[in-house]
Amino acid sequence: EFDTVYHEHLSFFNINSMEKACLMNDMVLTNVTKTDIHGTSYVFDIALFKHETDANIDDLKDCENSLYDINTYDEYSLNCIKYRNELHNALIEQKLSGKKLIGFGSTAKSNTLLNSMNISSDFFTCIIDENKLKQGKYTPGTDILVCSLDDISQEDVQDSIFVILAWNFYEEIKNKLKERFDNCIVMNIYPLFIE
C-alpha cells in the first residue's frame, strides 16, 4: 500500500512505539484492535492505571518483529514496484483494447500512485471526485481534469471503464456507479480486478 505513504501519513504508531509512549506518560496499553482503514490500522485502548493487557498484544507484537529487519523494506520495495507495473500494464491493456479510462477518486493516495507510474492526462478522460472544490481543477503532476459524476453520461460509459482510485471505498463507489449506469465496467486497483 505504498500509495498511502505521503506527507502526513508517513507516521504510524506500531504497538512497540505506542507502548513506549504510554510508559513515558505513566499509562498502560491494554488492548489493540486491527481495523481495515487504509489497509490496516490499529485502535489502541490505553489506561491510566495498571490493568491486565490483552493476550492479542503479544501476538501482534510478534508480527511486528520483522519491522526491524532491512530485508522487510527491500521486499516491500520490490512488491511496490511489481504491483505498480502490474497495474500500469492492466491500464495499458484496457487502453489498447479501445477503452477510455475514467478514474474515480482524486485523493492524495491516487495522485501518489498515478505520479509513481508517470501517468499523464492523455491516459484518463477525467477523474471523478464528489468534492466540489476539486471539480474543474487538474490533478497535481499528472494534469488530469477532475470532474463531477454529473459530467458523465450513459453514452460516455459505453466504451469506458471506471478505475476506482479510492480503492478503500471500492464497494460503495462500485454500487453507486452500477445504480447510475447500465452495463458499466469497474476496475478495482487494490486488489486488482475488473467486474
Q: Language-model features: where?
A:
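Short, glycine-/aromatic-enriched active-site segment of Class I SAM-dependent methyltransferases
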Residues: 1-11, 15-17, 22
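Extracellular glycan-modifying ectodomains
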Residues: 20-23, 46, 194-195
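Hydrophobic, well-ordered beta-alpha structural blocks that scaffold small-molecule cofactor pockets
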Residues: 48-195
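Conserved S-adenosyl-L-methionine
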Residues: 27-38
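A structural motif corresponding to the C-terminal end of an alpha-helix
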Residues: 24-28, 94
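Short hydrophobic/aromatic beta-strand or adjacent loop that forms the aromatic wall/cage
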Residues: 39-44
